[in-house]
Curated annotation (Swiss-Prot):
GO terms for molecular function: ATP binding; magnesium ion binding; phenylalanine-tRNA ligase activity; tRNA binding. Mg(2+) binds at residue 265. This is Phenylalanine--tRNA ligase alpha subunit. Gene3D superfamilies: Bira Bifunctional Protein, Domain 2 (3.30.930.10).
């Protein structure tokens, strides 16, 4: 039996070596490995058969022969595996090669949001007219949002259904999310008494309203010009120049309508002719009310000025034919791909 086992081992070696050499893929090689070196393989079966041999010397000799064969097959399989892996890599390199002469795929880049584009453009137009852009806090006290702007306590704009009021942990003074950036004008006039004062204040404003033409948060840019002998004619020239530049139409039809704002007197709303068939309101303006000057410590008998407020979303909707105000804030990539601008458009 021992002689038969030894003959089986020697014949097995030739067969195993042949199968290893003829394996054409890593999958075939793995099958060969399992059949000879696996837990249920032939080599394991030979070791199990050694238990039946009582002669310790013969058992040891046969065990050494089986060990030598196992190590040899293990090394042959490892070498063959390296060869097959190298062949696989070479095959992929030849068949999946990249043609470096082909143009690269364009990278996906972001776009400038229409509101950012409009804010930048509006600031630039007014900068050319000598207006400096200034910022102010979004959370304000009632004085800077209402009282200083000659807005009495009974005015509808101060009602809770129109304005977001905040709790003030420091004192009993109510705070609000500003309903316009006119509060920046008040802060500017409080801080500086060097004339002329010529500023625009872009920023977010908040009102308790939400539909196709209103959102709880939107953007305004408000302007202020204070000096001696400022008049309505200068205001009209400023507005005409801005609208003509922004819409790129020197023949744009513009009209001023009498209106009322508590912080200006006289006051006007400005419309433009839209598609030649109707008038669309684009901004409000007027001469600064004397009470506003008194509230910030400016002599209204010596100085006067004009102010205006422009809705950024309204300008963007008109210029870029956007029908729903809410789409500005939906965060849809497809929408931004369509309406967005390349960064080079920012001047």
């Amino acid at each position: 039996m021992n002689k038969e086992l030894l003959d089986d081992i020697l014949s097995l070696e030739d067969k195993a070596v042949s199968e290893i050499e003829n394996a054409s893929s890593l999958q075939d090689l793995e099958k060969v490995r399992l059949s000879y070196l696996g837990k249920k393989g032939v080599i394991k079966a030979y070791f199990d058969n050694l238990k039946e041999i009582e002669d310790a010397g013969k058992k040891r000799n046969l065990g050494e022969v089986i060990n030598v064969l196992r190590n040899k097959l293990d090394q042959l399989i490892m070498n063959k595996e390296n060869i097959l892996k190298a062949e696989e890599v070479n095959f992929k390199l030849q068949n999946e090669a990249v043609d470096i002469t082909l143009p690269a795929r364009p990278e996906k880049i972001g776009k400038v949001h229409p509101l950012s584009k409009v804010i930048n453009e509006v600031k630039l137009i007014f900068a050319h007219m000598g207006f400096k852009a200034v910022d102010g806090p979004d959370i304000e006290d009632e004085f800077h949002v209402f009282d200083a702007l000659n807005t009495p306590s009974h005015h509808p704009a101060r009602e809770e259904q129109d304005t977001f009021y905040l709790k003030n942990k420091r004192n009993d003074k109510r705070m609000v999310l500003r309903t316009h950036t006119s509060s920046v004008q008040i802060r500017t006039m409080e801080k500086t008494k060097k004339f002329p004062i010529k500023i625009v204040a872009p920023g977010r404003v908040y009102r308790n309203d939400f539909d196709a033409t209103h959102t709880p948060m939107f953007h305004q840019i408000e302007g202020l010009y204070v000096d001696e002998n400022v008049n309505m004619g200068q205001l009209k020239f400023t507005i005409h120049h801005f609208l003509n530049k922004f819409f790129g139409d020197k023949g744009l039809k513009i009209r001023f309508r009498n209106s009322f704002f508590p912080f200006t007197e006289p006051s006007a709303e400005v419309d433009i002719s839209y598609k030649g068939s109707k008038w669309i309101e684009v901004l409000g303006c007027g001469m600064v009310h004397p009470n506003v000057f008194q509230n910030v410590g400016i002599d209204h008998t010596k100085y006067n000025g004009f102010a205006f407020g422009i809705g950024i979303e309204r300008l963007a909707m008109l210029k870029y034919q956007i029908s729903d105000l809410r789409s500005f804030y939906d965060n849809k990539i497809s929408w931004l791909d369509h309406y967005g601008f390349h960064f080079s458009s920012l001047r």
